[in-house]
Regions:
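RNA pseudouridine synthases
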Residues: 1-230
Length: 230
């Protein structure tokens, strides 16, 4: 099974831990958790009896139920890759939830975009804080409310979220920039739709990318870590 081989390979080289969490790399193109499609969590825990599995899988199965998502602390969009965090105990998961409610959890991502974001930062600052809502007619995308007339396209209420640009590096030759961002609150496709809405789409974005800018690779958006602030 080629899919099993792929996940087996990914797991062997990209799992580590500290005193609070296990950190596992989620591959591209698969849902994080249980839903309509088979998810990364299902593959991970279905194979817990395999000889190549790590002990942490069975430990999480004992500590958390399926409804508790086996201790999962964050979710990534299907097309986003790299770090998922799993709490080692229910107490750690609850402490994380409490910190998140207090706005003290900062999640960090690296992304690659078209063009020099420095121009936008000089004019508007380093935060993108337009509200985001689910699209009324297209289930696979979100709407960024740059103007009030876009409210006719939204389903349900909008979400007040902020994507903060922490740092960036622009390469003039390729006309691309590597950007480090942080978020606190999170809504589906937040970083992708925010950057596209201001004219700097992420490379490989099949939904929010610009068709005239050709890039055949996967979405260049990576979950790289988190920080607890004061």
């Amino acid at each position: 099974d080629i899919q099993e081989f792929y996940f087996k390979r990914a797991m062997k080289v990209t799992r580590y831990e500290d005193e609070f969490c296990y950190y596992v790399r989620k591959p591209w193109g698969i849902p994080t958790t249980f839903g309509k499609e088979k998810s990364f969590l299902e593959y991970l825990f279905e194979w817990s009896e395999k000889s190549w599995s790590y002990p942490f899988i069975s430990l999480l199965s004992k500590a958390f139920t399926k409804d508790e998502e086996r201790g999962l602390l964050n979710r990534l969009d299907n097309a986003t890759t790299w770090l998922l965090y799993f709490a080692k105990t229910p107490q750690i998961k609850q402490a994380y939830k409490d910190l998140q409610k207090q706005g003290r959890v900062y999640k960090y991502y690296l992304l690659e975009i078209w063009w020099d974001i420095g121009y936008w930062i000089k004019k508007y600052g380093n935060s993108i804080d337009f509200p985001i809502a689910h699209h009324k007619f297209q289930d696979d995308r979100m709407v960024v409310l740059l103007t009030s007339d876009l409210k006719s396209k939204i389903k349900w209420a909008s979400h007040e979220v902020k994507t903060k640009i922490e740092d960036y590096s622009y390469d003039k030759q390729s006309n691309r920039a590597i950007v480090l961002v942080s978020i606190q609150k999170w809504i589906r496709h937040q970083i992708r739709s925010h950057f596209s809405s201001i004219g700097y789409p992420i490379l490989g974005d099949a939904i929010y990318g610009k068709k005239k800018e050709r890039y055949d690779g996967d979405l260049q958006l990576f979950s790289i870590g988190l920080r607890v602030g004061s």
